[in-house]
Curated annotation (Swiss-Prot):
GO cellular component labels: plasma membrane
Active site (catalytic residues): E334
Statement: the UniProt record of this protein carries the keyword Endoplasmic reticulum: no
Catalytic activity, EC: 2.7.7.65
Keywords linked to the UniProt accession: GTP-binding, Magnesium, Metal-binding, Nucleotide-binding, Repeat, Transferase
Residues where substrate binds: N299, H304, D308
SUPFAM superfamilies: Nucleotide cyclase, PYP-like sensor domain (PAS domain)
Chain residues that bind Mg(2+): D291, E334
Residues covered by the GGDEF domain: 283-410
Protein name: Diguanylate cyclase DgcM
Pathway where this protein functions: Purine metabolism; 3',5'-cyclic di-GMP biosynthesis
């Protein structure tokens, strides 16, 4: 598929989005998709109130898509000025030999599949047969849900009762929206899932237990007909520990281990053009580059552990001086960066002076006072982040050469 053929997708009545997985940027949306987006970005479609997915980051889908696994995401779209849910099937295609794209194709539920009242109010679990043995003895929590009765839970196996902490009678008096942290917002999502054939990758939710605690869960849900009742079978897997480890790894990838500040890698990620637009700071922002004066002397004379104390104390001082929305990074060694959204040069200079004065007051046991030099620059026109950084680095160099413990503008 090449660029000049994208317009042919406008002939389709189903919505189609073509997305670059690595930049997570929308390449093309056909007319049906644009109608559902209104003023929303594709990122907002994936993170809206009705949005559910297996993975937050699109590159994590690539292996499964290459192996032709069935992957579904539910997006939050606009219909008649109201937000609602839309199921999409994901497919991997090669735009070029080196550039794969993920195609999100909307799955519109046929009108004949509207939810109809079932007989599940009279549902009685039978103790014999394959289904009963499978349901009762399975070690995974399982729920039978009736979407047509407001998400009523009509049966739960022993593993589910143990997981949620309810007895069978209480569990079967509940609706799925009562155990899902989305509350009633889960109903349009359930409506979408009830139309899918099953077999797709699981979706992630947060469920609430009887004791009030919450757990991250992965749910395999699909339609099933049992004893003449058209229900949904939901298999629940607790992924709380997995999520905790993922969050720890993600934090480690984006943050400096010693100071806890954002790291240089995250700075470059945030200042990518697409990210800057998302943060609404593409033009009007300033940059501070802060260097600890005579830091090598501190390390040589007092030891590296004291040097680490200086860096951590400086990090906390920068955080305390930063305003809401400012971003603080450890650049490397004894250098730090502040990204100041919607900040003109004079305001940035004033903040830099506040930082300089505050740092000079920091007291660390066993050490003399230390100071910082700060370069300041405001983004100009269409200059790149590298061009801006060179200007602020030059300003810092002049501040160091002019005697240190001072603030200079580019």
């Amino acid at each position: 598929m090449i660029t000049h053929n994208f317009n042919t997708l406008d002939l389709l009545t189903s919505p189609v989005w073509i997305v670059s997985p690595f930049e997570e940027q929308l390449i093309y949306a056909n007319s049906a998709a644009r109608l559902l987006m209104q003023d929303l970005t594709f990122s907002q479609l994936r993170t809206g109130p009705y949005s559910v997915s297996s993975q937050k980051e699109l590159p994590k889908y690539l292996s499964d898509l290459q192996n032709q696994h069935d992957i579904i995401e539910i997006l939050t779209v606009q219909r008649k000025e109201e937000e609602t849910a839309l199921s999409c099937r994901l497919v991997l295609r090669e735009l070029t030999e080196t550039e794969p794209v993920i195609i999100f194709e909307g799955i519109e539920a046929p009108a004949t599949l509207g939810l109809k009242a079932s007989r599940s109010a009279n549902y009685q679990r039978k103790k014999q047969g394959f289904y009963a043995r499978f349901f009762l003895t399975n070690s995974a929590p399982m729920l039978l849900i009736d979407p047509s009765r407001d998400g009523q839970i009509v049966d739960a196996n022993l593993a589910a009762l143990n997981f949620y902490g309810y007895n069978h009678e209480t569990m079967c008096q509940k609706h799925t929206w009562e155990i899902n942290m989305l509350g009633r917002r889960v109903m349009p999502i359930m409506h979408e899932i009830s139309h899918l054939p099953g077999g797709h990758k699981p979706l992630n939710f947060i469920h609430k237990l009887a004791d009030g605690s919450t757990r991250h869960v992965q749910t395999y849900a699909g339609p099933i007909e049992i004893y003449g009742d058209k229900l949904m079978l939901c298999i629940v897997h607790d992924i709380t520990e997995q999520k905790r480890l993922e969050e720890q790894l993600e934090h480690a990838a984006h943050h400096d281990a010693m100071t806890g500040l954002l790291n240089r890698r995250q700075f470059y990620h945030i200042t990518e053009p697409g990210q800057m637009q998302h943060l609404a700071i593409a033009q009007d922002y300033s940059l501070l580059l802060i260097d600890t004066d005579r830091f090598k002397h501190i390390n040589d004379l007092y030891g590296h552990s004291k040097g680490d104390e200086v860096l951590c104390a400086l990090a906390r001082t920068l955080e305390s001086c930063a305003r809401k929305g400012d971003l603080v990074f450890r650049w490397g060694g004894e250098e730090f960066v502040l990204l100041l959204p919607r900040t003109p040069l004079d305001t940035a200079l004033s903040l830099a002076e506040t930082i300089r004065v505050s740092v000079a007051k920091v007291s660390i046991s066993g050490l003399p006072r230390f100071t910082v030099s700060i370069g300041v620059a405001h983004h100009e026109g269409n200059e790149s982040i590298d061009e801006l950084f060179k200007r602020v680095d030059d300003a810092l160099y002049r501040a160091k050469n002019d005697g240190r413990n001072r603030v200079l503008a580019a």
